[in-house]
């Protein structure tokens, strides 16, 4: 077996999650035969790829079915998040911007957004969390973060000096919220143009660095923020959060309609607070009716409320938290759905950064 034969053999393996050959997906990065032992490198499209240990068996079975009894392959697995830098000419270097929205308040949207951000970070991704709920910012409290964003000066290619906000960093996440700019008990009473200006600054004049995912906590309902984001960015998509009962589902339908109208693709639906109090399965049923992916359930559990109240929402990822596995499954489903869309979409040309 030479290297070309080995490569051709492995390129035909069908990815168990994406349903396409590794060669077609560009995931086989190396295949060499060194003294009779296959050396293989596979690059996954996200660190949140589920059950990565399956690849050892898939690789060994493919090699042995074609070349007979051979030593087990020395398999290395790496990852590179797929995505198109979403900022275009505003200079935001983020591979995937994901909006988290709902049709109404009270369904745990902000808590879910924060948990998703920390969940994706726990797999090794570089993640930011933007609180776009300007009238009711809760991300600073949920994450236990405080202080004011710093300001640094950058000199552009034209020689002009620009000021950029520095996100607050907490437990590995980069955070930004109007809650860092006003007192905790101060209401933000702004009209739409002021809201648009602030969000533009949060995107265009903030030093986010290079991120794999930027999670945007949307305000409840439908309105200005979705319009602003659709005008500024090319989003990977939106996650709609709702609870199982019908009254929440009715408003989730409106959120889905809003994202459709502003040309933001809907990644799928997450059912939050699943359990005996609110019931279960309503979001899954609606996802099936609308042909949208159902991304999973997050059970109703007092630990989420306690950790959020204490400013320790990151601790939902601790082994002791009863919802940890459910949350990680939702994160994996979101990451894989985004990866599927990116792999199926043609690459966009790189835009000039002004």
Segments predicted by a language model, with ranges:
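N-proximal, solvent-exposed amphipathic alpha-helical segments enriched in charged/polar residues
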Residues: 1-29
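Residue-level signature of catalytic and energy-coupling elements of molecular machines
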Residues: 10, 28, 63, 94, ...
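Extreme N-terminal, non-catalytic leader segments
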Residues: 24-27, 32-101, 331, 342-345
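Walker A/P-loop phosphate-binding motif and the immediately C-terminal alpha-helix
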Residues: 97-133, 256
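Phosphate-binding loop that captures ATP/GTP phosphates
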Residues: 120-185, 196, 203
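Switch II (G3) loop of P-loop NTPases
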Residues: 150-153, 178-194, 200-228
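Conserved catalytic-core segment of NTP-binding enzymes
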Residues: 205-208, 212-310
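C-terminal boundary of histidine-terminating zinc-finger modules
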Residues: 310-324
């Amino acid at each position: 077996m030479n290297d070309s034969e080995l490569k051709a053999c492995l390129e035909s393996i069908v990815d168990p999650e994406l349903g396409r050959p590794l060669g077609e997906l560009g995931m086989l990065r190396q295949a060499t035969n060194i003294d009779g032992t296959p050396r293989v490198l596979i690059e996954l499209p996200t660190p949140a790829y589920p059950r990565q240990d399956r690849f050892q068996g898939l690789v060994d079975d493919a090699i042995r079915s074609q070349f007979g009894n051979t030593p087990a392959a020395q398999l290395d697995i790496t990852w590179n998040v797929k995505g198109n830098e979403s900022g275009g000419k505003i200079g935001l270097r983020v591979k995937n911007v994901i909006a988290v929205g709902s049709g109404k308040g009270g369904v745990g949207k902000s808590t879910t957004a924060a948990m998703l951000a920390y969940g994706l970070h726990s797999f090794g991704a570089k993640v930011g969390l933007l609180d776009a709920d300007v009238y009711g910012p809760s991300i600073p409290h949920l994450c236990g973060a405080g202080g004011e964003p710093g300001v640094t000066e950058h000199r552009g290619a034209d020689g002009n000096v620009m000021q950029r906000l520095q996100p607050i960093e907490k437990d590995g996440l980069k955070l930004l919220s109007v809650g860092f700019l006003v007192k905790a008990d101060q209401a933000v009473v702004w009209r739409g143009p002021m809201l648009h200006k602030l969000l533009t600054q949060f995107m265009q004049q903030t030093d986010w660095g290079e991120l794999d995912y930027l999670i945007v906590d949307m305000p409840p309902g439908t309105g200005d923020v979705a319009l602003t984001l659709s005008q500024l960015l090319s989003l990977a998509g939106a996650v709609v959060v709702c609870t199982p009962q019908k009254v929440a589902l009715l408003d989730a339908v409106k959120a889905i309609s809003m994202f459709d109208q502003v040309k933001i693709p809907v990644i799928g639906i997450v059912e939050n607070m699943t359990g005996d109090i609110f019931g279960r399965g309503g979001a899954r049923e609606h996802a099936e009716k609308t042909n949208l992916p159902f991304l999973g359930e997050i059970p109703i559990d007092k630990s989420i409320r306690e950790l959020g109240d204490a400013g320790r929402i990151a601790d939902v990822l601790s082994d002791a938290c009863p919802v940890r596995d459910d949350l990680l499954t939702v994160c994996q489903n979101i990451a894989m759905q985004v990866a599927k869309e990116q792999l199926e979409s043609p690459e966009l040309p790189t835009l000039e950064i002004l």
